[in-house]
Amino acid sequence: MTHSVEDIKSTSRRLRGSLEQSLADPVTGALREDDQTLIKYHGSYQQDDRDIRDERRRQKLEPAYQFMIRTRTPGGVISPSQWLALDGIATRYANHSLRITTRQAFQFHGVIKRELKATMQAINATLIDTLAACGDVNRNVQVAANPLLSQAHATLYADAARVSEHLLPNTRAYYEIWLDEERVSGSGAEDEPIYGDRYLPRKFKIGFAAPPHNDVDVFANDLGFIAILREGQLLGYNVSIGGGMGASHGDAETWPRVANVIGFVTGDQLLDIATAVVTTQRDLGNRAVRKRARFKYTIDDHGLDTIVAEIERRAGFSLQPAQPFAFAHNGDRYGWVEGEQGDWHLTLSLPAGRIADTDTAAHLSGLRAIAQLQMGEFRMTPNQNLVIAGVPAEQRAQIDQLVAQYGLDAGNLAPTALARGAMACVALPTCGLAMAEAERYLPDFSAALQPLLERHGLAQTPIVLRLSGCPNGCSRPYLAEIALVGKAPGRYNLMLGGDRRGQRLNTLYRENINEADILAALEPLLARYAAERDRHTDEGFGDFLHRSGLIALPPYPTHRHLDLELLA
């Protein structure tokens, strides 16, 4: 019998369900149906290898079930020792690769059921957990990875960690099932004051940004905190609400949305405002229609003013007026930069965040060698790259030697700026929602687009490119200047017109087309951009498309771009 997600949550005994029985069942590599929903709250998804699904069906075998495990790492900061431990877990239990997500977490792929508990225990032994990395709860909290702002980053990271801990589910189910903690007894032992019996209507995402860099794409988050810095001092945060990328093909009732900036709070008000926003969504969000359950739809259905008033009522204070701020771009700075305190930070480009040893590069081995130096810290970026942070000046040469030896500089030296700034979700073969390739197709599509860029003198012009295997938008494609959103195998919707600052949604330009048609559609647009762009302002491709009238703002009945008055 199939149960609704809401029923599964409310009857789960605080996310326990029958997970222990499912894990102990030796007959199948899968979990029971309801437990496949509940395990998400513990940080894992049941998947199968879709590349061999048909072959196994012909052999009358069940699918090659496996599990993805995602870490909860607020701000994506870990120590070298933790990196080495996670490397070992990937090698022993997963598919010999690590993957950096667009929310600064790690994903392990290919873990089989009988090794799931051992893998979870190994992750927790590193002082990292996976609780609430998935499911209808607050997910991993993003933090700006800008290596130049050492002191500000430390403050943002601490604030993000506070918010992450505050919004964790209170249930002890995770610790009982995976870490063999003694069972909880007593009726009041596990109250969920923030989430309640049914948790949230849908997933919830929070990001901390530090202008002028918007690497977290803060306006794609349900709740955003934009640091207001004056002469290096953090005054507090502007608050944004209602961002979200997910949509459904051909469904006019769903759409992506950029967030609204609603006011300003001080650091000591963070937990109160976060609680107020999350509980407002808990109580007002749409639980009847799951595709309409994200906070963005709650705002659009009830009205922004109504939602802000409710947030202020729950918080017990009124928001102050938003402070001026300005974003310059949403990408990463590659190579070495010197921090405020005289140490150095190296940002490495890791295509689609995949860290593995391949025929062309040994990224997993190379980063293992760097971690063995035991210096600084590792920061995952929201663009799926990696910062080796806090390196003493005298150690730079040693790291440079390892970077070159293991091919870790290949991404930084990519032939096009487009390749350096591209993102893609995992998609096939493991994601059950994927309609087309994304991560595996990214290198081929970038290579196919390169001759067009070179022909028009654009090889070193930054253009934000993102690929998504389905319309749910994990790679934040709807903010990209060029995006491919999977529609069917080998076919994509071509989306154009986002900007380099993560402040404007793109729009559908061509629907359900193949690579040849995509390139044919882009060729004349790139030619005009090369000839007519405003070089004095370093006009971006998406900005040019709008200024020239080649595309228009998307027809979504929602918030499409940031109110530019706030950027004064």
UniProtKB/Swiss-Prot annotation:
The lineage of its organism: Bacteria, Pseudomonadati, Pseudomonadota, Gammaproteobacteria, Lysobacterales. Its EC number is 1.8.1.2. Keywords: 4Fe-4S, Amino-acid biosynthesis, Cysteine biosynthesis, Heme, Iron, Iron-sulfur, Metal-binding, NADP, Oxidoreductase. Alpha(8)-beta(8). The alpha component is a flavoprotein, the beta component is a hemoprotein. InterPro entries: CysI, NiRdtase/SiRdtase_haem-b_fer, Nit/Sulf_reduc_fer-like_dom_sf, NO2/SO3_Rdtase_4Fe4S_dom, NO2/SO3_Rdtase_4Fe4S_prot, NO2/SO3_Rdtase_4Fe4S_sf, NO2/SO3_Rdtase_FeS/sirohaem_BS. Pathway: Sulfur metabolism; hydrogen sulfide biosynthesis; hydrogen sulfide from sulfite (NADPH route): step 1/1. Siroheme binds at residue 474. GO terms for biological process: cysteine biosynthetic process; hydrogen sulfide biosynthetic process; sulfate assimilation. Component of the sulfite reductase complex that catalyzes the 6-electron reduction of sulfite to sulfide. This is one of several activities required for the biosynthesis of L-cysteine from sulfate. SUPFAM superfamilies: Nitrite and sulphite reductase 4Fe-4S domain-like (SSF56014), Nitrite/Sulfite reductase N-terminal domain-like (SSF55124). GO terms for molecular function: 4 iron, 4 sulfur cluster binding; heme binding; metal ion binding; NADP binding; sulfite reductase (ferredoxin) activity; sulfite reductase (NADPH) activity. Pfam families: NIR_SIR (PF01077), NIR_SIR_ferr (PF03460). It comes from Xanthomonas campestris pv. campestris (strain B100). This is Sulfite reductase [NADPH] hemoprotein beta-component. [4Fe-4S] cluster binds at residues 425, 431, 470, 474. Its cofactor is siroheme; [4Fe-4S] cluster.
